[in-house]
Amino acid sequence: MKNKNKIKIKVNGKKILLSESETIEKLVKRLKLPIKKVAIELNRKILDKNRLDKVKIKKNDKIEIVHFIGGG
């Protein structure tokens, strides 16, 4: 498998390869996380959930995703 047009990023401390045109929204869907129940930090800045489809992931980005789980 060629890594042409792929970029390395870190998600929750793990290195992964993605297409260079990937958005944050696509990444969250790929990880099978419910967009309404996550908080996402990109390079130490919290992202607006309403703009996830517009934020393109770049080489060496550091992404932290926190998934909220209900309980009591």
Regions found by a protein language model. Give the residues of each.
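Ubiquitin-like/PB1-type beta-grasp interaction modules and other compact soluble beta-rich domains
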Residues: M1-G71
